[in-house]
Amino acid sequence: MSSYSSNIDRLQREIARLKADDSREMSKEKQAQSKAHKAQQAISSAKSLSTQKSKMSELERATRDGAAIGKKRADIAKKIADKAKQLSSYQAKQFKADEQAVKKVAQEQKRLSDERTKHEAFIKQSLSSMRTTASATMEAEEEYDFFISHASEDKEAFVQDLVAALRDLGAKIFYDAYTLKVGDSLRRKIDQGLANSKFGIVVLSEHFFSKQWPARELDGLTAMEIGGQTRILPIWHKVSYDEVRRFSPSLADKVALNTSLKSVEEIAKELHSLI
């Protein structure tokens, strides 16, 4: 709770308590006035001097009590007025703070919307660029079942064994160690591989998250998936859901294979079953 809200709650409670005090004092004041009125009437109708003196004393006491109560009620009224002024000030500040918070949320939503629009434009541009590159080349283009996007540090630990298992099952793989030849343009061959693969396997690992080139391949695969030309198949390699989500929330929501739960052969069979 903000300091404004806590002060508003406190002042509202204090004002309510003071009003309750004033209500009790008002009842006492009415009683004192009633006593004074009765004493006044008794004095007028008294037949003896002693009765008059007694009723006069009652009138004086009731008058003093009424005056004291009136002074107390005036003090309470002043306190209520002071606290009402403070309450109004805090309420105005709270209203201004709420307005600023709403404005900040709206600005953040606009920023996220602008970022999403820019990212979508980038993906569309990437898709257009890949199509142009694929159209401009005169080389015979080979089609692949799988394009494997990975960090070089994961080759020996996992990727090489996965490629071998898939090839043993008869799958055609775009894998840089097998597909690229001396003198090839790396970017052109990667774009061709992306454009001519049915599925894009993305090996998500700590190494993958820290590399620029795999991230560029992932953008290309995302563009192809949006265009309906391929599907991204994520494999989690020694990473958690939170780590994947920090890198890409959309990838974290995809059904993924996990090297911690399945062997290389089991993963290869599941992937091959999609062809």
From Swiss-Prot:
Location in the cell? Secreted; Host cell membrane
Enzyme Commission number = 3.2.2.-, 3.2.2.6
Which protein is depicted? Probable 2' cyclic ADP-D-ribose synthase TcpB
Where is the sequence biased in composition, kind Low complexity? 39-48
Task: Please tell me whether the keyword Hydrolase is annotated for this protein.
Answer: yes
Instruction: Fill in the subunit field for this protein.
Output: Homodimer. Interacts with host TIRAP, and probably host MYD88. Interacts with host TLR4, abolishes the interaction of host TIRAP with TLR4.
Span list, region Disordered = 17-66
Domain remark from Swiss-Prot or TrEMBL: The TIR domain mediates NAD(+) hydrolase (NADase) activity. The N-terminal region is required for localization to the host cell membrane.
Keywords in alphabetical order: Host cell membrane, Host membrane, Hydrolase, Lipid-binding, Membrane, NAD, Secreted, Virulence
Question: What's any GO biological process attached to this entry?
Answer: signal transduction
In terms of superkingdom, the source organism counts as Bacteria
Q: Could you tell me which species this protein originates from?
A: Brucella melitensis biotype 2 (strain ATCC 23457)
UniProt biased composition (Basic and acidic residues): 17-32, 55-64
